[in-house]
Amino acid sequence: MRSSATKGAKLKNSPRERLSSFNPQYAERYKELYRTLFWLLLISVLANTAPITILPGCPNRFYRLVHLSWMILWYGLFVLGSYWEFVLVTTQRVSLDRYLNAIESAIYVVHIFSIMLLTWQCRNWAPKLMTNIVTSDLNRAYTIDCNRTKRFIRLQLFLVGIFACLAIFFNIWTHKFVVYRSILSINSYVMPNIISSISFAQYYLLLQGIAWRQRRLTEGLERELTHLHSPRISEVQKIRMHHANLIDFTKAVNRTFQYSILLLFVGCFLNFNLVLFLVYQGIENPSMADFTKWVCMLLWLAMHVGKVCSILHFNQSIQNEHSTCLTLLSRVSYARKDIQDTITHFIIQMRTNVRQHVVCGVINLDLKFLTTLLVASADFFIFLLQYDVTYEALSKSVQGNVTRYK
């Protein structure tokens, strides 16, 4: 926080103004990037998943205080709504559903707090991140494909919008249009998932941007190594340094979002197993579930599976680009010792595991992690079944004893 404040103070004087006044190309690229990301940034600021300082023209303290007040007000209403949902709705459910829903709601409260805390912490360095992206793209001669980026953003926001509309509609329907129950349930379960989805849209975009840049570097390296008679050592070294910077940036992105990722995995894991358990109960007792509840459960299953798979997919895409580059380097060999030494150094760098895809020290973000989640989910689901059978047997035993004593 202290270093962020120092960076923020430096920012007021210039990266933006200095570079734009001395480098017209930088100024044009900077405006182009903002135009491309504008709707995502605006929606993120309104949803409290990005600081208001990231918007052009909003760097001063007044806007920060307004945004902080909005975050505190929104979070206070959210926590209050979650409390009343627990008191008026969750406590009326059967034992197992009550416990799982209460834990899930508590995780959402903590998760939203972590997102907003991160938003406030990055108020100083978020504008500098935009500056660094433009500067590094200029250094590596990378031109942003605005249309492709806009399509990616539109797809992410479209998926969030579809989920929001369907979840709100079916939530109201399953609560039989009882207004207070519907509002409390939407506040406690739907809104946190909408907020986290908007937050992770930024995460997906950052990772996808890294993968696109890695691909471009690998294409440039391939041209240098295979299409030229004598590769230029300076160019290979430059590409190697750009790859190292992207690896460091990947690590920084995952470290920034690591607690949010952990809380999302825990929340998705609990809700996924709860929905599976409710599906099992619906199959065992068809009278317990109607059509709307089935559709609602399928919607939540799809949403949670989609979130987990998206996080792993975008990390895996970076690892695939990394492997492609390493394969290319391993295929070539040169008689000149200076070139071969440079290639060897590059290979060692690519093979060095700096744990850029590891979060919270234990979760390795690749598609293999799905196997771990499925095994854990199967074990937890078996536990829920055993608990349900035991609880039902104890309930019948207590009920029988009460009847006998009467």
UniProtKB/Swiss-Prot annotation:
Organism: Drosophila melanogaster
Protein family per UniProt: Belongs to the insect chemoreceptor superfamily. Gustatory receptor (GR) family. Gr10a subfamily.
Name of the protein described by the UniProt record: Putative gustatory receptor 59f
Its job: Probable gustatory receptor which mediates acceptance or avoidance behavior, depending on its substrates.
All ranges on the Cytoplasmic side of the membrane: 1-36, 91-99, 176-189, 281-364
GO biological process, one term: detection of chemical stimulus involved in sensory perception of taste
Glycosylation sites recorded in the entry for this protein: N147, N254, N401
Main location per the UniProt record: membrane
Parts of the chain that traverse the membrane: 37-57, 70-90, 100-120, 155-175, 190-210, 260-280, 365-385
Family matches, as Pfam families: 7tm_7
Expression across tissues: Expressed in the adult abdomen and wing. In larvae, is expressed in neurons of the terminal external chemosensory organ.
GO molecular function, one term: taste receptor activity
